[in-house]
Amino acid sequence: MPLSTVALIFGGKSTEHEISIISAKSIAAVIDPFRFQVLPLYITHEGKWFTGEFAENILQLDLAEMLRSTSLDATGNTLRQMAMHTGQQGFDFDFFKAGIDLAFIALHGSYGEDGRIQGLLDTFGIPYTGCGVLASAVAMDKALTKLCVTEAGIATAPGITILSSEYFADPKSTQKSIEEQFTWPVFVKPASLGSSVGISKVHHIGELIAALETACRYDSKILVEKAMQGREVEVAVLGNNAPEVSITGEIEPGSEFYDYADKYIHNAAKMYIPARISPELQEQVRKDALRAYKALGCRGMSRIDFFVDETSGTIVLNEVNTIPGFTDISMYPRLFAASGLPFNELVEKLLQFALETPSGARS
């Protein structure tokens, strides 16, 4: 029986480019070589597609060490220089349409997790891992996610949405509105980025301008939310029509909140599996995660994050990640490993779920 060809798509134009490469490297290492032939497909920061030797060489890089020893900018510049000096030509889309049986999407953030690559694959009729166009797009937008899960009866942090154009047209009015509606601290975040990129915790009015301008550099829509008390608790969900829910996990940030540097550079955060909350709260978090997954129309996989206040028993949904990280420190594979599903079997199941769903038949 001939092997099925899996396009492992990684890199991309988002600020999470480097993390995508680390995820793809982990995934490639465990795909069953007796069932699947892996075709690495690397997308540069500028959006140029490569396969073959150059893509394979990118997968061999120790990006995790590069991020720790240099910086995000320096690592990105190294990758750009490699792309500029490769003699290889760009990707042949005719081959893509004819030679791929399914795709494992290992892209994170914009242009990968937001429905765009999913729409392209649907157009070509290629099955792929994870959520479809609509669920991906809605979950990527934190403001839209809040609307959807609130309708399903799931609590979210009090917040408002601000367009960057509104802020720049009248900064003082925006600041005044925020000050009148919230007590400090608040979080200011781009509506559609992951890995905590562009997020600031604001403790007083003097920090607000810098936080708003930082968020506006990354997105045209900004979310301002009340900072919630409690533990950061995460749940992994896997499946299509009958999703499985992992046990809970907890993040204890190494800094004031779980930001990009804490996640991928300093590695200072502590993880607890299961989360240090009561069994009753753990079960309720798992139920809320499944409700959110279904409300958004998710398929394949998602990691769903909450704030849990044990004193009050309050559970608040923070965000839904439709393509969670697959790095050595990523919570999604760790949660399923702790639930009895090893990493290689997790990847195998994701490929099976992709093949179960005809392209274009998912939300």
Curated annotation (Swiss-Prot):
Residues that coordinate or bind Mg(2+) 2? E319, N321
Question: What sequence ranges are listed for the domain ATP-grasp?
Answer: 146-352
What does the entry comment about cofactor binding?
A: Binds 2 magnesium or manganese ions per subunit.
The record lists ATP as bound by 179-234
UniProt xrefs under PROSITE patterns: ATP_GRASP, DALA_DALA_LIGASE_1, DALA_DALA_LIGASE_2
Task: Fetch the InterPro entries from UniProt.
Answer: ATP-grasp, ATP_grasp_subdomain_1, D-Ala_lig_Van_CS, D_ala_D_ala, Dala_Dala_lig_C, Dala_Dala_lig_N, PreATP-grasp_dom_sf
Q: Which UniProt keywords apply?
A: ATP-binding, Cell shape, Cell wall biogenesis/degradation, Cytoplasm, Ligase, Magnesium, Manganese, Metal-binding, Nucleotide-binding, Peptidoglycan synthesis
Q: Name one GO biological process term.
A: peptidoglycan biosynthetic process
Report what the protein is called.
D-alanine--D-alanine ligase
Query: Could you tell me which species this protein originates from?
Result: Chlorobium phaeobacteroides (strain DSM 266 / SMG 266 / 2430)
Its lineage reads: Bacteria, Pseudomonadati, Chlorobiota, Chlorobiia, Chlorobiales
